[in-house]
Amino acid sequence: MEYKQDKFTTSWGAEVKVFTREGTNDWNTLYSCLVEDEYLVADLDNSNGGVCVDIGAHAGGCTLALLSRGFKVIAVEPLPENTELIMKNVEINGWSNNFTLHKKAISDVSGKSVILRYGNEKTESGAHHRFIGNTIDSSEWQENLWTQGREIKVDTVSIDDILKNVNSVNLLKIDCEGAEWSAFSKVSSTSLDKIDNIVAELHGVASTKNMYQEFNNLIGLKFNDITSVKFKNINNQPTIGLAYFKK
């Protein structure tokens, strides 16, 4: 794998060194997280540090943004090419002591083995983003695999287990192309009580009429949907859209 080194300056003035892979969308992804602040990391209160969770970490954009603001980060990413890049990006900035990586696929339960399939295009984030997502019934997962691409076998981890030894979470970000519905389908009230903010890339399914409201129902109505405040507009339709939920 060939890497190119670059550097971004965040809106809060932090300089972040990065590696990107030739022929991929890594640079654009990192730019949107670090320079454009896609997940609104600058808005978070970091006066007491704290812990954040990055599910679907990809190249590490959100993770690096959070680490640069002084948060400890727990990341989840199953694809080996991505986890290698994330570790390189964390290490080059000297933030390894504040970083934990689960090289697993997010799921409703831990300890299962699932087959993930890579997309053939280098610009694809990863197969697990596509093979889960049309249902919150995990029994249907393996029927949603791509028909082409390379396959790997990985173990799963649940949100409950990720947060087992964590007292509080300032932000939980999730971007896993549909897996959010399964991931949150069995989350305990104990885990949800620990989380202050959730930013999710929601992927509507065929039955979804208002995915923002349905996702808030899924997380137990413990949060206020402030998507319109954070992102200025909402397209309430069965499609992809960022959503922000706050206690």
For the regions a language model picked out, list residue spans one by one.
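Phosphate/nucleotide-binding beta-alpha loop and adjacent structural elements of enzyme active sites
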Residues: 1-247
